[in-house]
Amino acid sequence: MTARSWVGEVISKYPFHVVRHKGILRILTNTLQIEHFPPKSVDDPIRRELELQSTEASIHEWEFKEKEGLSLLVPTTVYPPREDTGLLFSCLSKLGKGDGRKLLEIGCGSGAVSIALAKLGWEVTTCDVNPLAIVATTGNASYNKVNLTAIEGGLDEGGDFINQQLIESHGPFDIITWNLPYLSPVKGDEAKLGPLEDAGLIDTQENNGWGVALLQSLTKEINILKQGGAIYLLHTNNERGNLLQSRWRAAGWATRISSELQFDDGERLTCFAAWKPHEKATRQSHDVLDSTNQYLLEKDLPTGSMVTAKQQLSGRGQRKRVWDTSEGDYAGSWVLDPEMMDCCPGMMQLDAGVAVIDAICASQDIPLPSAHWTNCNPFSNYNLSIRWPNDVWAASGKLAGCLIEGRQTGKHQKVVLGIGVNLGISNSEDYPSTGLRDITNSVTLERFTDLIDTAVSSQFETGILIPSRPNQKNTVWALMTNHLSRGLSLTQDAEKLTVTSISEGGELICHDGRKRRIISDSYNLLWD
């Protein structure tokens, strides 16, 4: 019997009741005859739960904003506000005042995040499989003078919502959020929690964890997330956590980190958002085009729109160099938000290179480099790297190229991103080249098209419910060092340069043995 199946049994056999004393919520249990339980030598989840419940609930003062806090009564088996609580609220508070927008929190615990967001004007529905968490959240909301809806329910191990119809009746939601349980299941004789606490804190052994269980639930016919809505998940950097964004990408969701919290012991908490990519954009596929970039520059299509071509007659790369598209290769372009040109086009091209590698990683179920720069090292198996200013390379040659182009017409500005990826074996005579199928045979052109569109959305899409674009300098540099570590040197005007880093704007920072040089143009540069 799983931890969650004990929840109803505990409540039905040994009911809890709630009383108020001087405005403070107290959780009490009925008088129990402990000697009627099995001997202590036999593990009994109900005994463990009730022994925990005999401990007095504690009061937590949680400051969620400067000079503004909550007073929360937290029963023993309910999760109290901790560092991860603060991180999750910090990320969600960046979305601004709720103004009546709807939010669902899964796993409310003491109600800290839900109550704080209700104070910001969100219409909050919250749920938890621990009935004591629902009792505590309801009482804490009343004590802190906010209105919200608390429902006993959540996800089961199969990815189905408990009390789904009741939860749906309060939706669909603009935001769904969950501080995911991440403790590993208890093994053998290891110390056990009570079953209610197990249900809220321990990751499931099924379906690759609760984060994937939620992903599976969203593929079913449920009316829970609004079009244009977003999911905010918080996880730790264990094996499942490191793979979580890759698995959401593979299922067709764009993802982007909102914030992180690093601990001295090496644990890292990450909060990321997930959304359906380019929902208001168009997607076109053509047999033949002169250039996908040129096509979008000449058309009036919504931001995020993508066009692909099976063959490009005049495909181009940096400095109008020819980009050959062989049959079965990928050639595509996107309309980007023109305000991005106020940023740094050089770094944007490097970020596009990260998107290409992200798409490959999602296809192979390995952690994304954009999720954290430490995920760049495992790519030694594929020997993927970024070569400044706009190329993705594998061990045997160039795999992909990226090009940002803009056009100004009066006050109207248009920005497009083009990406070309060799999927088959490339035969370029100008430089060593390779194809994705030299690395893996598991990705079709159709599948890669979906993955790269999701990756580009993850890098560049903007929206009121989407986190701001993060600075990926560390990730880009880590992928560049994969290329530099092969012993390559850089020459400009016959003078050898040592690459030492990149600037915030994506410029190369080099040293010629006498002084530092900052290079923003690839003209007259030679890698050898």
Q: Where do the model's predicted regions map?
A:
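Long, positively charged amphipathic alpha-helical accessory segments at protein N-termini or as interdomain linkers
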Residues: 215, 233, 341-386, 394-528
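Mobile active-site "lid"/loop adjacent to the S-adenosyl-L-methionine
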Residues: 178-214
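Conserved SAM/SAH cofactor-binding pocket of Class I
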Residues: 89-169, 175-186
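Short loop/edge segments at beta-strand edges and connector loops
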Residues: 152-154, 287, 386-388
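N-terminal amphipathic/basic-hydrophobic helices that include classical n-h-c signal peptides
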Residues: 1-28
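SAM-dependent Rossmann-like transferase core, predominantly class I methyltransferases
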Residues: 35-116, 120, 160, 264-270
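N-terminal lobe of the biotin/lipoate ligase/transferase fold
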Residues: 254-351, 355, 361
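Conserved Class I SAM-dependent methyltransferase catalytic core
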Residues: 212-263
